[in-house]
């Protein structure tokens, strides 16, 4: 394993960690970054799964006390059971649709135009929702995660289905969807973090089972570098985002998405990046 390959794995791990939990689409960024870096190992798809796993481990570490409290409280605490039920309810719709339409999504939507359109449409949706937030005089209806109802969770779960379209962003769909349905900005952000845990863990197990032969002695070092880079950068990003949403809205991310969407369209049809 040469130093150039190590640096490329490190860079892609950082890109994943910085974009997985921001409403900007980690998929689009990984495609562009991977192509510019000419990072196309045989295990590229498995590498993407590994660095996603590293990113979600950062959320698990950040919320380790809450997760432990929920797990240990399931037998006796109503709040723990309701929290778990809400996460399950919000997870089911996207998982069901992903299993049904996986091949169609990869064959039809994994191209410059759909990804660019999704980025721009997602940016416009953020601007619209933030505009509604500014016009409202009353506070958001849901001020804490524990106040979420199963119906609230279902609505956020349906919003998460939009993330099956490459470029829409899972975090963007759940955060902005949550805000649209009455969740306070920080509550929507934290619930999005928790929803990522079963979704990404499930995707990791599914893809690993499909392509377990990619995990061999030659690839372990590369995977480990990407995983650690994604973990560290995601941990820093999650902490930063929680501070950011306390006093800022998501308008800046909306304009960034729109600009990045146009950039993806440009480089996609210029031949600068490869769509595989």
UniProtKB/Swiss-Prot annotation:
Its EC number is 3.6.1.27. It is a multi-pass membrane protein. It catalyses: di-trans,octa-cis-undecaprenyl diphosphate + H2O = di-trans,octa-cis-undecaprenyl phosphate + phosphate + H(+). One of its GO terms (biological process) is cell wall organization. It holds the Pfam family BacA. Its main location: membrane. Signal peptide: none annotated. It is found in: Cell inner membrane. The chain crosses the membrane at residues 85-105, 108-128, 187-207, 217-237, 253-273. GO terms for cellular component: plasma membrane. InterPro entries: UppP. GO terms for molecular function: undecaprenyl-diphosphatase activity. Keywords: Antibiotic resistance, Cell inner membrane, Cell membrane, Cell shape, Cell wall biogenesis/degradation, Hydrolase, Membrane, Peptidoglycan synthesis, Transmembrane, Transmembrane helix. Bacitracin is thought to be involved in the inhibition of peptidoglycan synthesis by sequestering undecaprenyl diphosphate, thereby reducing the pool of lipid carrier available. Belongs to the UppP family. Catalyzes the dephosphorylation of undecaprenyl diphosphate (UPP). Confers resistance to bacitracin. This is Undecaprenyl-diphosphatase. It comes from Burkholderia mallei (strain ATCC 23344). The lineage of its organism: Bacteria, Pseudomonadati, Pseudomonadota, Betaproteobacteria, Burkholderiales.
